[in-house]
Amino acid sequence: ITYFNKEEDRGYSDLYLMNLPEGQTTRLTDTDYNESDAGWTPDGKFITYLAKGQLWEMNPDGSNPRQVTDIPDGINGYVYAPDMSKIVYLKDVQLEPTVQDLYPDLPKAKARIVDDQFYRHWNDWVDAYTHLFIADYVPAQPITTGKDIMEGERWESPVRPWGGVEQ
């Protein structure tokens, strides 16, 4: 559920759990940032979600939130291996230099270098590619890096517009 703060002119999404037969809801999170992409670990023991650009787990009652990833610049999605030995996560990768990379003496430049027909998709500029990374999952250790299984490829997975990580 998203709550709006008029003074800050923004909304915050929190997670709830609903007992369908009884119709009872339990608020799981109450933070000043967004939680999204909720799911369950394959063993059914923990609720998983994205918050602050990272993967988190918590008990089904909302207690003991634990950050699973600590990936620089954050992640966009995730999937656990059925045996929970690995996690695949999505992360944006910059492959082409930006104007600021090429011209550091022009830090305020708002230019773009376009050398491909696919430079914009719907309402987004294409300035990075979403790649799949795979990492070992050890519950007590935050994941700080993974293997880019698409390294150097100028393709995305999943393909825009995102239809879900299962693509």
Residues covered by each model-derived region:
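Beta-strand-rich domains and repeat architectures in extracellular enzymes and scaffolds
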Residues: 1-13, 166
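Feature marks short, surface-exposed loop/turn motifs that line or immediately flank catalytic pockets
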Residues: 3-5, 95, 153
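Generic domain-boundary/flexible-linker signal
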Residues: 8, 66, 79, 98-99, ...
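Conserved beta-strand and immediately adjacent loop positions that scaffold enzyme active sites
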Residues: 14-16, 54-56, 131-133, 167
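Multi-bladed beta-propeller domains
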Residues: 18-34, 58-74, 106-112, 136-164
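Conserved beta-propeller blade repeats
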Residues: 30-48, 65, 72-90, 119-132, ...
